[in-house]
A protein has these predicted regions:
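Short secondary-structure boundary/capping segments
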Residues: 1-6, 45-56, 88-95
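Short catalytic/ligand-binding loop motif for oxyanion handling, primarily in non-cytosolic enzymes
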Residues: 40-43, 83-85
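Generic detector of isolated residues embedded in canonical secondary-structure elements
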Residues: 31, 51, 158-159
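Glycine- and acidic
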Residues: 42-49, 141-146
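Conserved C-terminal portion of the radical SAM core fold
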Residues: 1-41, 55-79
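Radical SAM enzyme core and accessory elements
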Residues: 64, 68-171
Length: 171
């Protein structure tokens, strides 16, 4: 799957140069933007785990090594930020204390790469006795009461399970 992304981009570049009638002297640049899967509440994939930090990093490394053409540029979200996104997307009330402690450690403008300090977030989790992987990397069972199960979001649990099963069957 991962290598196939870059292979497809290379085919686009190759097709451009094989196209007759294209303007000569012009170059092509294909930008490949990839996103890490982040399970979100109220979706059929809320039950799925996110890849671990190490798995995400490995996929990014495969992508980087697979790009051999200067005609292809690669963009992706930082692994540590994706992990935190999954943690807070599927988290519960206990994360409030983690947020507060991270804030006290200076985590305020984390959407800016130069202001993001993953190590401070990990310290805050440790101080609170919480493991980010419990939230991000754990498969949830269909009968688990989720932190957002009490909310009415207009879609039934049965519908989400049905859509999840259809997606796995590629329907």
């Amino acid at each position: 799957d991962v290598r196939g992304i870059v292979e497809l981009a290379q085919r686009v570049v190759d097709l451009y140069y094989r196209t007759e009638g294209r303007a000569k002297g012009h170059s092509v640049n294909v930008t490949v933007s990839v996103s890490t899967f982040v399970p979100k509440p109220f979706t059929p994939f809320q039950y799925e785990p996110q890849d671990t930090f190490e798995q995400i990093e490995e996929k990014h490394q495969i992508l980087r090594k697979s790009v051999t053409s200067k005609k292809i540029s690669l963009k992706y979200h930082h692994s540590d930020a994706s992990v935190l996104e999954a943690v807070f997307a599927r988290g519960d009330r206990r994360l409030g204390e983690v947020m507060y402690r991270a804030f006290k450690k200076g985590c305020k403008f984390d959407s800016w790469d130069d202001q993001f300090h993953y190590d401070r977030w990990l310290e805050a989790f440790k101080e609170c006795g919480l493991d980010p992987s419990f939230y991000a990397n754990r498969r949830r069972s269909f009968d688990e009461i989720l932190p957002w199960s009490h909310m009415d979001y207009g879609v039934t649990h049965e519908y989400l399970v049905r859509e999840y099963n259809k997606a796995l069957a590629a329907q």
